[in-house]
Amino acid sequence: MTRPELRDDVRIVDTTLRDGSHAQSHQFTESQVRDTVRALDGAGVEVIEVTHGDGLGGSTFNYGFSRISDLELVQVAADTAEQAKIAVLLVPGIGTADDLRKAADRGAEVVRIATHCTEADVSLQHFEIARDLGMQTCGFLMMAHRTTPEELARQARLMVDAGCQVPYVTDSAGALLMHEAKDRFDALITEVGDDAWVGYHGHQNMSLGVANSVIAYEAGVRYIDGSLCALGAGAGNSPTELLAAIFDRMNIATGLDVMATLDAAETVVRPYLNRWPKIDRNAIVQGWVGVYSSFLLHAETAGARYGVPVHEILRRCGELGYVGGQEDMIIDVAIQLAKVSGTVSEPSASLVAG
């Protein structure tokens, strides 16, 4: 196995059309995908991720239904991109090997296979299949704050030995402080740096995604994720346009045209935003107690339904140690909090229908 060849000093991977799907309630249209891919492609972005926020197969009752299927959106993206590769996310247990094969048939050339930070073993067959399909492979070790740097590195080694070319420190909760992030970058690079690149995926819940991206590069990380307008779960991701500007100021080559990324954010993405990612009480609580960023909208729905403050739901989810895939437990938390506070109320007709 070889590492993907790097065009520049660092590769900025854009996840507007995947992580951003959480903030858009998975309602991207074909025209939005087409226009966003065209703008990112023209700005020099080399890898553009496109799927439901929870990856291939994520359009379900538990995670939220997509307006348009993943495969259709991947096809639109692949048909639009001229130089960029289209990536998909696959979470074993949500997406299947068959989903991956179909995505590759529609034009996906990169797959990012995601597991909880201590469960890399469930991804091994998926990496083997992806390599057999000729795809570039990245591995997301999600909720990276929930284990030690040493254990995270051991999990990265499992992925790399199975065919992963780029294991990621994935700060799904936006919880990592700067020294904690660096410890994890150093551990992964020491363990797998001779065999694979290391990546970083951050969230802005504690306003540290961008700072940690700079620390990541200085530590030797060479794949860094961003999202136009920070569009993503929780308080959003590190803004792609901001990463482009910062690395340009640092004389670090990204291959991105700074003005073109700014134009993409302001003239393409901003007009279709359902909500602007923001660092508010709810998002800060997610980063503070380490809650999976995509829990935010689910907690807002449950809070409105049962008359419970959203930040209290999120805080309790953190105390209980819930991880990605346990979104269904948010309702239980809201009900229990409502019982304690005496605010149990019947769901409104509109909430039941929606």
UniProtKB/Swiss-Prot annotation:
GO terms for biological process: catabolic process; L-leucine biosynthetic process. Pfam families: DmpG_comm, HMGL-like. InterPro entries: 2-IPM_HCS-like (IPR050073), 4OH_2_O-val_aldolase (IPR017629), Aldolase_TIM (IPR013785), DmpG_comm (IPR012425), DRE_TIM_HOA (IPR035685), PYR_CT (IPR000891). It comes from the Bacteria. It is an enzyme of class 4 (lyase). Residues 10-262 form the Pyruvate carboxyltransferase domain. SUPFAM superfamilies: Aldolase (SSF51569), post-HMGL domain-like (SSF89000). This is 4-hydroxy-2-oxovalerate aldolase 6. Keywords: Aromatic hydrocarbons catabolism, Lyase, Manganese, Metal-binding, Plasmid. Its EC number is 4.1.3.39. The lineage of its organism: Bacteria, Bacillati, Actinomycetota, Actinomycetes, Mycobacteriales. Substrate binds at R18, D19, S172, H201, Y292. Belongs to the 4-hydroxy-2-oxovalerate aldolase family. PANTHER family: 2-ISOPROPYLMALATE SYNTHASE 1, CHLOROPLASTIC-RELATED, HOMOCITRATE SYNTHASE-RELATED. NCBIfam families: 4OH_2_O_val_ald, PRK08195.1. The active site is at H22. It catalyses: (S)-4-hydroxy-2-oxopentanoate = acetaldehyde + pyruvate. The keyword Transmembrane does not apply. The record marks R18 as: Transition state stabilizer. Mn(2+) binds at D19, H201, H203. One of its GO terms (molecular function) is 4-hydroxy-2-oxovalerate aldolase activity. The keyword Manganese applies.
